Regions:
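Bacterial Sec-dependent N-terminal signal peptides
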Residues: 1-28
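Membrane-proximal, proline-rich intrinsically disordered regions
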Residues: 21-61
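Proline-centered turn/helix-capping motifs that create local helix->coil transitions or kinks
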Residues: 21-22, 58-63, 131-140
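Conserved, well-structured interaction surfaces
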Residues: 37, 41-46, 54-56, 70-135, ...
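Short, conserved phosphate-binding/catalytic loop or strand-edge motifs used
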Residues: 141-148, 195
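Aromatic-lined, polymer-binding surfaces characteristic
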Residues: 185-194
Length: 197
């Protein structure tokens, strides 16, 4: 009887000890808003891919290497380019920028957060600058869209003037947040001022 009581007591004690373990942990191999956007290096990593919005230097250099017609214009003249085959209507980077702006407030370091928020505002302005340059009127999105939000997904184009006013507001925010120290590889206050001009 004593052995049974001892065994039962140890079993119950073991159950209590192991049931108090917190096994509801976030996976360390995946990103989520709850586990990311917590510090400067994470904000920097997220905003680094915004730089792919800039034209590739290789393409610019190749265009000037000969006296032939530029490949983009050449494709248009040969009839190979159409709205369906052109990659200029992609909105992926805008989603990434808006996603960042919705979640960056989780970083407790306000100074670092403002710097990278400035990068995001600059690139949202640059994104729309390029869209207006290519297409004229476009829809303005300043939030992440859900795939089931038909009303926002089918939003009509807005007047160019409204879009450019929003671009200027984003540039003003970026100018106030970006560092003033010159940098050859990162956007700064001076980059934003150049785009605004």
């Amino acid at each position: 009887m004593n052995k049974n009581n001892l065994f039962s007591s140890l079993t119950l004690l073991g159950l209590f000890v192991f049931s108090s373990c917190n096994l509801d942990l976030a996976p360390e191999d995946t990103l989520s808003p709850k586990t990311y956007f917590k510090n400067g290096p994470q904000l920097e990593l997220w905003t680094n891919h915004f730089y792919s919005l800039f034209p590739d230097v290789d393409d610019l250099a190749k265009q000037n290497a000969d006296d032939n017609i530029s490949s983009e214009l050449g494709e248009t003249l040969m009839g190979q380019r159409s709205a369906a085959s052109e990659n200029g209507w992609t909105w992926e980077r805008l989603r990434d920028i808006n996603y960042y702006l919705q979640h960056s407030n989780q970083c407790p370091d306000e100074h670092v957060r403002k710097q990278y928020d400035g990068v995001a505002y600059f690139f949202r302005a640059y994104f729309y600058f390029d869209k207006v340059k290519r297409y004229g009127d476009v829809p303005w999105y300043d939030q992440v869209l859900n795939s089931n939000d038909d009303k926002l997904l089918a939003k009509p184009r807005q007047d160019r003037e409204i879009i450019m006013d929003s671009v200027m507001q984003d540039l003003d925010k970026a100018i106030g947040m970006l560092p003033t120290k010159k940098d050859q590889v990162r956007v700064t206050k001076w980059t934003a001022l150049a785009l605004k001009s």
